[in-house]
Amino acid sequence: MKKIMIIEDDTIISKELYELLVNAGYEALILKDFSNAKEEILKSNIDLILLDINIPYQNGEQLLKEIRKETNIPVIMVTSRANETDEILSISYGADDYITKPYSPTILLLRISADLARIGR
């Protein structure tokens, strides 16, 4: 079973994503301690990350840059920021995909599946 980490500061959205992933057959993990996000990611043996840009302690794009220094785990940015600049920055920092809220659950699941298949996970 593929394990997906949710890094989202909005607890309602985190729970919605969790339920969506579990119902689709994934193992889901919600990151609750944002102060040690990179360390939690590296020790959790996950297959994919859903990452919001607006998270406590540091910007999600900065966390993405740090993640990319250590691992090639697929990262999908899931954010309310629908401007081109944030999307360009996220992709240039190594995001595999960029989805804006509100998102279509079907589209999100298809993109997760495609990103996992692309890297053979």
Language-model segments: which ranges?
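N-terminal/domain-start alpha-helical segments
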Residues: 1-120
